[in-house]
């Protein structure tokens, strides 16, 4: 995209956060309701609040941490759920906290620090909650000039060209110092040579790293009716950006990338701005009678695209995708029948009501770019619900066979009623090698970590944390990826617990 086109794109996206988001929440005491529910359901502590802005501790080690495993697991997630007498009305509105689990021959050390966003600073100075969130706005909420005013930097991590970025899907990345986790500030990708900046343009929380080391991402600007596409070079410079008009607009959270295409599923959760809506989420309408649109974009020409259709569905996360020489794309996703887990579950849980929405099952998709057809099929037996899929990073955007994900078996649910198993699933054989966590532990996202010198998808580890609500501790767990069912080969136990987070990245070295 030429510099003039960058300017046009920025002008199109320079629109304020929808005014309807200023409709304020009622006077119900969500903090009190949550505290009361916590007495009956102690596992709700996983959605509690942080008691400080900075945590740091050496971990108590059990088992054997491999000498060749050296690096840092960076994670982020919503952690600041209550401040100044106001409790957020949606899990995704919590102020972000970035974690670093530093793993080396002499042990594991953990550090976590609240991201010092513009929102955090403004509310600290005012001594009260200021900005609207997904589901509601606090009393006396103020208007904003754009999404970055309320950006909590709480969803995912990107480590690219030496920079550590905390991501949120509706605004700019926040740069974090990888050594002490202090906040550098909002980060803006720019053209090579310091050209046009894309500051403030939505940068989704799920970028994809291509085979050449470059990064692809998208963002959605609801008020402008646009999807924005990004291509970031391996050197961190902005190589290209494009846009696609979408009407009606929706809320895509993730996407997949192949050798030649970008693919997004656009659920029929249509943007319908209303002046009296309590929060941005409530400016959307679920239309199950409408199809889920599938947008396919040419990587070499971001203006070239076409749409296909699937039955109505909701997808938070994809595992991976690849494309064969005949132009057939195969990908996988945790597919839910509707967005109730976001619109209901993640709201109700914040006031202590464990009312779980309709969970996702794992599906495989086959998209023929030449015939322009798409089909879908369940990959697991009914009753196995999944989320947080990930893959060996060495096969990102390429042919793959194995997926790591969390799951719950409807026939063997945990006391807390949510995900309680970590899996390594073999697409070709259909084998699911899994470990069931004790009911007192709620697992967070687990990642595949390659063993140095190994072939892709062989000989690696699975690394992930869990919230132990019975002991008030965070536990980092390491599994042998070849024998997941045997349980962790090593653990690192912290003397504190931090509310459940979302996504992370392991950085070797």
Segments (PLM) and residue ranges:
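Blade-edge beta-strand/turn elements of extracellular beta-propeller
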Residues: 181-193, 232-246, 293-311, 365-383, ...
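Structural signature of eukaryotic scaffold interfaces centered on beta-propeller domains
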Residues: 137, 144-160, 203-211, 256, ...
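Well-ordered mid-protein domain cores that form the structural environment of catalytic cofactors
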Residues: 117-239
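N-terminal export signals
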Residues: 5-25
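N-terminal regions that are enriched for targeting/export leaders
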Residues: 26-97, 103-106, 120-139
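Short, conserved, GDST-rich strand-edge loop motifs in beta-rich repeat architectures
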Residues: 83-86, 267-286, 336-356, 408-416, ...
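Substrate-recognition/cap regions that form aromatic- and gly/pro-loop-enriched pockets
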Residues: 377-473
């Amino acid at each position: 995209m030429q510099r003039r086109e960058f300017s046009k794109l920025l002008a199109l996206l320079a629109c304020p956060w929808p005014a309807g988001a200023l409709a304020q929440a009622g006077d119900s005491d969500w903090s009190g309701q949550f505290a009361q529910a916590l007495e009956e359901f102690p596992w709700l502590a996983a959605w509690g609040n942080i008691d400080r802005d900075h945590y740091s501790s050496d971990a108590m080690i059990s088992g054997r941490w491999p000498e060749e495993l050296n690096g840092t697991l960076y994670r982020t997630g919503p952690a600041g759920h209550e401040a100044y007498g106001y409790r957020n009305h949606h899990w995704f509105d919590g102020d972000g906290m970035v974690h670093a689990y530093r793993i080396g021959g002499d042990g594991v050390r953990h550090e976590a620090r609240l991201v010092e966003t513009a929102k955090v600073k403004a509310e600290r100075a005012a001594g009260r909650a200021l900005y609207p969130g997904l589901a509601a706005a606090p009393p006396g909420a103020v208007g904003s000039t754009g999404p970055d005013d309320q950006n909590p930097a709480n969803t995912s991590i990107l480590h690219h060209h030496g920079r550590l970025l905390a991501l949120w899907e509706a605004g700019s990345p926040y740069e974090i110092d990888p050594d002490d986790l202090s906040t550098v500030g909002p980060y803006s990708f720019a053209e090579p040579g310091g050209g046009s900046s894309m500051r403030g343009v939505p940068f989704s929380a799920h970028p994809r790293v291509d085979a050449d080391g470059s990064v692809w991402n998208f963002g959605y600007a609801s008020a402008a009716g646009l999807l924005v596409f990004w291509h970031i070079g391996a050197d961190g410079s902005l190589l290209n950006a494009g846009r696609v008009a979408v009407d009606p607009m929706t809320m895509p959270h993730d996407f997949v990338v192949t050798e030649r295409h970008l693919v997004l599923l656009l659920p029929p959760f249509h943007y319908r701005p209303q002046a009296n809506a309590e929060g941005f989420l409530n400016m959307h309408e679920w239309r199950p009678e409408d199809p889920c649109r599938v947008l396919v974009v040419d990587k070499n020409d971001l203006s070239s695209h076409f749409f296909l259709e699937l039955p109505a569905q909701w997808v938070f996360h994809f595992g991976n995708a690849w494309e064969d020489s005949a132009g057939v794309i195969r990908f996988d996703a945790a597919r839910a029948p509707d967005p109730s887990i976001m619109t209901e579950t993640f709201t109700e849980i914040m006031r202590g009501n464990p009312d779980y929405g309709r969970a996702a099952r794992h599906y495989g998709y086959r998209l023929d770019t030449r015939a322009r057809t798409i089909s879908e099929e369940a990959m697991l037996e009914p009753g196995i619900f999944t989320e947080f899929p990930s893959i060996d990073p060495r096969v990102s955007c390429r042919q793959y066979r194995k997926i790591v994900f969390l799951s719950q078996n409807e026939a063997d649910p945990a006391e807390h009623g949510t995900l309680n198993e970590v899996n390594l699933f073999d697409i070709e054989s259909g084998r699911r090698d899994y470990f069931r966590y004790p009911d007192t532990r709620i697992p967070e996202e687990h990642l595949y970590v390659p063993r140095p010198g190994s072939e892709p998808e062989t000989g690696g580890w699975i690394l992930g944390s869990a919230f132990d609500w019975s002991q008030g501790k965070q536990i980092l767990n390491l599994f042998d990826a070849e024998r997941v069912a045997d349980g962790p080969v090593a653990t690192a136990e912290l003397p504190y617990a931090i509310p459940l987070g979302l996504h992370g990245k392991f950085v070797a070295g």
